[in-house]
């Protein structure tokens, strides 16, 4: 009733929604009534393949699908099939404000305070190399694997060097949706040389920028990840990233084909999680999944769980460590340059411009739905995933 009243009294031009479609099931139930008057725009993302055919009804219920990742755009098109021709489907990646997240150097007006912040963070310890993880403590984010892989990295470089390294985890250390990270730390980490610090309090944006600048690399090794905002924020702060190649994280690594073109996806090449292409942006340390298995639940019956091995993550951390501070800084600034570029469109300004363009296009394309349809009934069509699940092939343009 509230939506009906809002449309009648306020007369909006459109309804814009975002996040998981299951949050909007109640709205999709009345989509015909709404779309006889105004369009529905959806800024959407989906974590992984196989294409979620169980989302088809949701995607059909909107007029504009703004896909946050390249993978999501492909999923929207694959799931909709012939219905896609009636939609506006565009790639609109997340954008970060470069005035909020930026590199801090000696010219920063509060550089002395930044040095004090870093000193307090490590409780007086002399730390030369910092790994940062900023995410929720939930199973798909693999927080325990983060600690295990960091411990393995420390063993790879030796105890004396490891004493001057640190892992910072900005998260709730104990969460029923994840695990008890204090217990994981105690079990895996010898405190004499493995330094793991937790940042559990909510922080303002300016404080988060300080944390990103303390780090040498930000890592995210989720087994399902629609985008991975901490990576984009880290890149905007001029820092390198380490990622599991899945979901929208692979967009941020900017994998390129043999012609140097930023890769795109289709039914024959739905993802790069099988390591079809390995060359990526200088700012990224990419770790490919060692295992792809199917997870699911009644509302979402199937989805790939793309897990990378802690050993591979540890090796990638060692590679970043051995680059040295000057090379890490150069590569991190290359990442910032790219997220600010017209190619990536990952700045807040570029994202806003893309949203405006897409909304304008959708308004031009919008045709109000009729009050009813006459549907000729027949046998239920076979419903199965038609894109490749193995042996991906890439089409060069």
Model-derived regions: residue spans:
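Aromatic "clamp/platform" in nucleotide-sugar-dependent glycosyltransferases that forms part
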Residues: 223
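A charged, aromatic-enriched C-terminal amphipathic alpha-helix characteristic of glycosyltransferases
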Residues: 304-312, 325-357
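Nucleotide-activated donor-binding/catalytic signature segment of Leloir-type glycosyltransferases, i.e.
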Residues: 33, 178-206
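Extended catalytic core of nucleotide-activated donor transferases of GT-like folds
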Residues: 1-61, 70
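C-terminal alpha-helical cap of glycosyltransferases
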Residues: 345-395
């Amino acid at each position: 009733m509230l939506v009906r009243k809002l449309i009648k009294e306020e007369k909006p031009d459109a309804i814009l929604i975002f996040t998981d479609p299951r949050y909007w099931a109640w709205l999709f139930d009345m989509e015909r009534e709404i779309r006889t008057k105004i369009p529905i725009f959806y800024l959407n993302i989906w974590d992984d393949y196989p294409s979620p055919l169980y989302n088809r009804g949701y995607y059909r219920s909107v007029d504009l699908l703004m896909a946050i990742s390249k993978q999501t755009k492909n999923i929207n098109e694959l799931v909709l099939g012939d219905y896609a021709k009636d939609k506006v489907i565009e790639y609109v990646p997340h954008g970060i404000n470069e005035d909020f997240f930026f590199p801090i150097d000696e010219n920063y007006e509060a550089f002395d305070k930044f040095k004090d912040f870093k000193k307090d963070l490590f409780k007086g310890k002399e730390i030369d190399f910092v790994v940062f993880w900023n995410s929720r403590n939930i199973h798909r984010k693999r927080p325990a694997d983060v600690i295990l892989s960091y411990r393995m990295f420390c063993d790879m470089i030796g105890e004396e060097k490891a004493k001057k390294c640190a892992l910072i985890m900005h998260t709730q250390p104990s969460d029923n949706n994840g695990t008890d990270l204090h217990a994981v730390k105690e079990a895996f980490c010898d405190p004499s040389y493995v330094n793991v610090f937790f940042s559990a309090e909510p922080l303002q944006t300016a404080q988060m920028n300080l944390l990103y600048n303390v780090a040498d690399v930000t890592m995210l090794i989720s087994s399902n990840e629609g985008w991975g905002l901490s990576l984009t924020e880290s890149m905007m702060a001029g820092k390198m990233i380490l990622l599991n190649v899945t979901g929208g994280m692979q967009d941020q690594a900017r994998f390129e084909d043999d012609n140097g073109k930023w890769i795109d996806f289709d039914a024959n090449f739905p993802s790069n999680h099988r390591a079809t292409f390995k060359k990526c942006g200088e700012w990224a340390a990419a770790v490919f999944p060692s295992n792809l298995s199917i997870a699911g639940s009644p509302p979402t019956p199937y989805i790939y769980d793309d897990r990378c091995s802690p050993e591979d993550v540890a090796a990638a951390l060692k590679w970043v460590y051995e680059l040295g501070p000057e090379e890490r800084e150069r590569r991190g600034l290359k990442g910032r340059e790219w997220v600010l570029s017209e190619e990536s469109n990952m700045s807040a300004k570029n994202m806003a411009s893309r949203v405006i363009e897409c909304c304008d296009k959708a308004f031009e394309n919008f045709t109000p739905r009729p009050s009813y349809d006459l549907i000729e009934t027949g046998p239920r069509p076979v419903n199965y995933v038609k894109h490749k699940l193995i042996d991906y092939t890439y089409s060069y343009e």
